[in-house]
């Protein structure tokens, strides 16, 4: 019975990823595009770009060819095969599409966002996939999450970065808004990047999340944040966020209802980080061009 349940869980995950790829690969007929007005044609082309890139992102995922006692999923990023243990009964121990989008962005934009020797912290690291990719790209990484998730997080990070990463990643507890001055004193923190994937959803700690962003940011810190929009509550968080930070939409994935943002503290923008163009999703040999 246990073996059957494991098989059912893994087959469900396979089907889920296959469906995402299938949906991401749907295009309008060329004749239909020809009959559209120019503005609609532009939207159609952008929709096609979005679906093409989403399909490429989802193709980075694979599942085991055999049933294992512990469910895991595989990913190809930063030139490595990454294996992630999940716990499907916990939000923080499942790989969500937002994490895949952020991993793909980091990998395909290494010139604009070079992580080598940079100090990077991920909040709400969950399974650790984003932190693993950042580490494999050369960053000093601190992966953080709630205490009950740290065991699985540490296991995944150690398993996938040992002997592979330039710098050994750290795993630390971070409950948003709790003991920030004690655990992350402002005088000693100096993060170049804050990474966050799908940390905004219908939970009661959005104000604490905002406080945490503000506490961890220096005037030159860059936040790379991927967000899936689900409810009006999330839109209100974005409004609150923009009171403290200059927020720039880098890219949008309508087929996933996901947006990728870059942010820095308001009125403190350094000349080192000029305004960038929208990240246009154009796959060229598996890469994206700005």
Swiss-Prot record:
Xref: SUPFAM superfamilies: S-adenosyl-L-methionine-dependent methyltransferases (SSF53335)
Residues that coordinate or bind S-adenosyl-L-methionine: 96, 124-126, 145, 176, 197
Keyword Transferase: yes
InterPro entries: Methyltransf_16 (IPR019410), SAM-dependent_MTases_sf (IPR029063)
Pfam families cross-referenced by the UniProt entry: Methyltransf_16
One BP term from GO: methylation
Presence of the UniProt keyword S-adenosyl-L-methionine in the record: yes
EC number, as in UniProt: 2.1.1.-
Disulphide bridges: none
Highest taxon of the lineage: Eukaryota
Enzyme class per UniProt: transferase
Alphabetical UniProt keywords: Methyltransferase, S-adenosyl-L-methionine, Transferase
Record-level Gene Ontology MF annotations: protein methyltransferase activity
PANTHER family cross-referenced by the UniProt entry: HEPATOCELLULAR CARCINOMA-ASSOCIATED ANTIGEN (PTHR14614), METHYLTRANSFERASE-LIKE PROTEIN 21E PSEUDOGENE-RELATED (PTHR14614:SF1)
Protein family: Belongs to the methyltransferase superfamily. METTL21 family.
Function in brief: Protein-lysine methyltransferase.
Name of the protein described by the UniProt record: Protein-lysine methyltransferase METTL21E
Organism: Bos taurus
Higher taxonomy: Eukaryota, Metazoa, Chordata, Craniata, Vertebrata
């Amino acid at each position: 019975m246990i073996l059957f349940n494991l098989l059912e869980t893994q087959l469900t995950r396979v089907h889920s990823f296959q469906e995402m790829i299938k949906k991401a690969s749907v295009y309008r007929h060329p004749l239909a595009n020809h009959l559209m007005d120019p503005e609609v044609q532009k939207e159609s082309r952008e929709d096609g770009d979005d679906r093409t890139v989403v399909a490429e992102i989802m193709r980075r995922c694979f599942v085991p060819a055999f049933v294992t006692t512990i469910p895991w999923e595989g990913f190809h990023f930063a030139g490595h095969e990454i294996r992630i243990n999940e716990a499907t009964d916990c939000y923080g121990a499942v790989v969500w599409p937002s994490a895949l989008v952020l991993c793909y962005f980091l990998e395909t934009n290494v010139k604009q966002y070079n992580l080598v020797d940079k100090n990077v912290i991920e909040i709400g690291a969950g399974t650790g996939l984003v932190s693993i990719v950042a580490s494999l790209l050369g960053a000093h990484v601190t992966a953080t999450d709630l205490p009950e998730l740290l065991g699985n997080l540490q296991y995944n990070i150690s398993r996938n970065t040992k002997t592979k990463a330039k710098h050994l990643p750290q795993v630390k507890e971070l409950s948003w808004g709790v003991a920030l001055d004690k655990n992350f004193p402002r005088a000693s923190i100096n993060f170049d990047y804050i990474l966050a994937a799908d940390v905004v959803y219908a939970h009661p700690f959005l104000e604490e999340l905002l406080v945490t962003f503000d506490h961890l940011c220096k005037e030159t810190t860059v936040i790379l944040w991927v967000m899936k929009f689900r409810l009006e509550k999330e839109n209100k968080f974005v409004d609150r966020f923009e009171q403290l930070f200059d927020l720039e939409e880098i890219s949008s994935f309508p087929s996933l209802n996901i947006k990728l943002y870059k942010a820095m503290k308001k009125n403190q923008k350094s000349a080192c980080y000029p305004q960038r163009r929208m990240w246009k999703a154009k796959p060229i040999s598996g890469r994206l061009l700005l």
